[in-house]
Amino acid sequence: MNKISPLGSNWNEFEQQIFNEEEIRESNLRVALIKELITSRQQLGISQKQLETLSGVKQPMIARIEKGQTNPQLETLLKLLAPLGKTLSIVPLRVKNA
């Protein structure tokens, strides 16, 4: 692991010190969703502007979502995912064994 400070903490240790398990899990889910959105859009060769036309979600909002600068509503995510041939699904969380 890369050191993030002269004190020797790595990112995982630092993350666990400042966030609780629920916050870490929530952040990981958000990152995975954004990554899937970007990857799907790029694999289809669709620009953010084209996705705006297909989804009805304005390009600046798409950019903010992809940068993780906003927490979009469920309806907005569904509008973005549909033209990419994707949807959301409710599945059990993978929980670390105690």
Curated annotation (Swiss-Prot):
Residues 37-91 form the HTH cro/C1-type domain. SUPFAM superfamilies: lambda repressor-like DNA-binding domains. The keyword Oxidoreductase does not apply. Keywords: DNA-binding, Transcription, Transcription regulation. Residues 48-67 bind DNA. GO terms for molecular function: DNA binding. This is Uncharacterized HTH-type transcriptional regulator HI_0659. It comes from Haemophilus influenzae (strain ATCC 51907 / DSM 11121 / KW20 / Rd).
